[in-house]
């Protein structure tokens, strides 16, 4: 799923050449989601793409549903808009929000667990500002709507939910509620490890087990 380095950061002043970030997003989607992508993706069980936003997808593995959402850093494309039309950037961010929330709401209720993946660290970049919206596109928290939606989703499904993201440095995990866990995957700025994630039965509970693929040891670092 796209992240800020692939499009939202392409207008930075230290880059040569610099690009309009919205133009880069169109280019990126054309490059990524072609016939070869679909040929491989369609080998996944129950693979689907969101018709209105093809980067949002879902599939199943071992009765766990995997869901991708397009949530990029810079508060999902709302901050540091340096070369694009800001009002158009805000409108597109609002559309992404609506599509993402709709896609999450369509999760298959028969799955035994859910893995939800996106690029932005919506937790570390938390602010005290209100959620971004059509009526408040600036001086707002572009990630609040997702923190709230994911918490509500986990509370509704009553099944294990794992949120996977990147964006910030630490390789860590954090239980957010009884059945909601986040994993900040390794790999920002440098390769450090590969996370192996399993859904395991422990007594009467089904929980996520996250281990290092290199050492086999469990991930004990807690995200702050």
Please state what every model-predicted region is.
Residues 1-96, 177-201:
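Extended active-site neighborhood of metal-dependent phosphoesterases/phosphodiesterases
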Residues 67, 83-176:
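His/acidic metal-ligating clusters that form di-metal
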Residues 169-224:
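Binuclear metal-dependent phosphoesterase catalytic core
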């Amino acid at each position: 799923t796209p992240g800020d380095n692939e499009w939202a950061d392409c207008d930075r002043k230290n880059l040569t050449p610099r690009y309009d970030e919205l133009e880069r997003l169109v280019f990126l989607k054309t490059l990524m989601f072609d016939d070869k992508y679909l040929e491989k993706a369609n080998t996944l069980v129950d693979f689907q793409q969101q018709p209105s936003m093809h980067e949002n997808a879902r599939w199943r593995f071992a009765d766990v549903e995997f869901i991708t959402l397009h949530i990029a850093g810079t508060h999902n494309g709302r901050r540091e808009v340096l070369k694009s039309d800001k009002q158009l950037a805000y409108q597109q961010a609002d559309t992404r929000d609506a599509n993402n929330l709709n896609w999450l709401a369509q999760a298959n209720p028969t799955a035994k667990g859910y893995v939800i993946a996106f690029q932005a660290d919506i937790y570390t970049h938390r602010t005290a500002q209100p959620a971004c919206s059509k009526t408040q596109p600036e001086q707002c928290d572009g990630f609040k709507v997702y923190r709230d939606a994911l918490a509500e989703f986990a509370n509704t499904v009553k099944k294990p939910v794992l949120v996977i993201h990147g964006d910030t440095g630490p390789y860590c995990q954090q239980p957010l509620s009884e059945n909601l866990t986040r994993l900040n995957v390794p790999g920002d700025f440098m390769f450090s490890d590969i996370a192996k994630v399993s859904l395991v039965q422990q007594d009467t509970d089904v929980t996520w087990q996250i281990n290092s693929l290199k050492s086999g040891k469990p991930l004990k670092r807690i995200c702050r």
